């Protein structure tokens, strides 16, 4: 049995309500089951906070975070748009032996080692881990930087916001430059300072690029602007990205703003190159690097300030209730953050410990089910996910993975005509999928699995059933896997007009030649069947796409 040493799987456990079998674990050696950990817990919209710093410092952090959100709403409201399907975990680690190191990723190349913050993100959820105990960050050699946990958090939080807005597609240098620019924002209820280098009184601030790069050579622009970033994303690379973005947006008469915007826009369709750079900035990499060197040494720039008039300052953030974290909350949040960092064994052990101690919170059961599914333990995953679904857990991926497991089960025992699925089997698979469809975030895989399930049905799907799959195509118009599922369903189950339209769309959006050829063959197969009659003066030509593909 993988997981905590000294545990063995036993017979199933029956819980109240519908008969749901759960794995049961027995502790062979009680010394191997760690005691519950003492953490503080707080919740604000979209975030769960797990803290091992003092109560006073935790309250200060939450006030600062809420005030930061208000500041962003005032000066950059677009950054706050977007859904957070699963609350983002904020883990605040305290003094020695209180946990930051245990969250370091298994693959140290994912995030640079030696910092006081970690950021993890998947399509479903994110996590930020902050070290409040570290005094200095070692940059290499004898170079050190004062560790500021608040600035580290601002950087991680803005990274989270930027990736949510750009769907993780921003060039690494662009994301890093914006992250460092935003993280340097200073604010209180009466004053907001943005894009300022230095403290305004002749002294430097932590993270200022001119201090970081004063004695450093400029990294070649081709390396800095690489589409996947440099091989090592050092603090000095981050500082140069910050310098480049700051110079373009706020330096020397704002002369580089328009070229910078053109460059970023064209990168949406073109790979970075010196030719593209010259077309936008009218300078070579080397020429611009020389300018940037001068800007680093003599930073003449425009800052942005907001000062509230008397009686119009930002409101005081409301107090956030805080309490001792429940065992299942510690296990679930820590376990999932460890899993995000690739620490799969530690994640499983952390998740299973509160379960062994008797915790049955639905969110813990869902997390355990997803963990077991990711580890390939489908039988245990199904039991945990069935129990979580029975308790009406609010997590879309739990229902998606449960539907996958149910489909795998019923397809080997098909009871319908022609070896297809009967109505009861279809309902068993589609029920969790339609629950997932109602929950955030929308997932292409949900619609793809709906299409796959209908393709195995003994009963022919109706137009309204195909319409649900088309709904997914509208939401994810460039997802070729979903588009292929929808096309094949329409082609095989008697919807030639929709099959042709979907296949033609697939030809347009597919990037792989093999996918394009497959879509092209399907479209050609239906060409004669759906070829419209020539329009007469009294007739309107047929739409190029059936109504079902049109946006409402």
Residue ranges and their predicted role:
Residues 421-435, 491, 496-514:
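TPR/TPR-like (Sel1-like) alpha-helical repeat modules
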């Amino acid at each position: 049995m993988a997981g905590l040493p000294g545990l063995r799987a036993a017979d199933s456990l029956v819980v109240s309500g519908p008969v749901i079998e759960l794995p049961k674990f027995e502790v062979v050696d009680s010394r191997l089951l760690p005691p519950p950990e003492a953490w503080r817990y707080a919740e604000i919209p979209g975030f769960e906070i797990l803290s091992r710093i003092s109560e006073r410092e935790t309250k200060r952090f939450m006030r600062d975070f809420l005030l930061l959100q208000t500041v962003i709403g005032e000066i950059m409201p677009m950054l706050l748009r977007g859904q957070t399907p699963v609350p983002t975990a904020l883990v605040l680690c305290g003094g020695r032996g209180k946990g930051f190191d245990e969250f370091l990723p298994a693959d140290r190349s994912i995030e640079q080692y030696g910092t006081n913050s970690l950021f993890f993100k998947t399509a479903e959820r994110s996590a930020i881990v902050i070290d409040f105990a570290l005094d200095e960050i070692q940059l290499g050699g004898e170079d050190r930087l004062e560790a500021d946990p608040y600035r580290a958090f601002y950087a991680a939080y803005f990274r989270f916001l930027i990736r949510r807005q750009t769907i993780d597609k921003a060039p690494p240098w662009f994301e890093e430059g914006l992250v460092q620019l935003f993280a340097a924002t200073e604010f209180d209820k009466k004053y907001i300072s943005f894009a300022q280098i230095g403290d305004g009184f002749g002294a430097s601030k932590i993270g200022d690029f001119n201090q970081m790069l004063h004695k450093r050579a400029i990294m070649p622009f081709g390396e800095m602007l690489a589409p996947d970033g440099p091989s090592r994303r050092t603090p000095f690379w981050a500082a140069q990205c910050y310098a480049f973005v700051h110079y373009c947006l706020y330096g020397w008469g704002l002369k580089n703003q328009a070229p910078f915007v053109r460059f970023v826009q064209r990168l949406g369709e073109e790979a970075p190159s010196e030719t593209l750079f010259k077309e936008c900035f009218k300078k070579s990499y080397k020429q611009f690097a020389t300018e940037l060197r001068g800007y680093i040494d003599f930073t003449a720039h425009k800052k942005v300030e907001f000062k509230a008039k008397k009686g119009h300052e930002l409101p005081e953030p409301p107090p956030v209730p805080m309490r001792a974290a429940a065992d299942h909350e510690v296990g679930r949040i820590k376990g999932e953050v460890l899993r995000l960092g690739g620490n799969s064994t530690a994640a499983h052990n952390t998740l299973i410990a509160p379960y062994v101690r008797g915790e049955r919170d639905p969110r813990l059961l869902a997390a355990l089910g997803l963990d077991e599914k990711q580890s390939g333990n489908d039988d245990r995953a199904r039991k945990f996910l069935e129990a979580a679904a029975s308790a009406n857990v609010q997590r879309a991926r739990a229902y998606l993975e449960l539907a996958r497991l149910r489909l795998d089960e019923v397809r080997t025992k098909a009871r319908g005509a022609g070896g297809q699925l009967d109505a009861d089997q279809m309902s068993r698979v589609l029920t969790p999928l339609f629950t997932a469809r109602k929950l955030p975030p929308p997932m292409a895989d949900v619609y793809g699995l709906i299409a796959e399930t209908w393709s195995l049905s003994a009963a022919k799907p109706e137009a309204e059933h195909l319409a649900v799959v088309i709904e997914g195509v509208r939401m994810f118009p460039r997802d070729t896997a979903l588009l292929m599922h929808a096309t094949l369903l329409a082609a095989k189950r008697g919807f030639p007009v929709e099959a042709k339209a979907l296949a033609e769309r697939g030809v347009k959006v597919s990037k792989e030649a093999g996918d394009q050829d497959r879509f092209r063959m399907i479209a050609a197969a239906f060409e004669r069947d759906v070829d419209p009659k020539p329009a007469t003066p009294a007739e309107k030509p047929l739409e190029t796409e059936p109504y079902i593909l049109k946006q409402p």
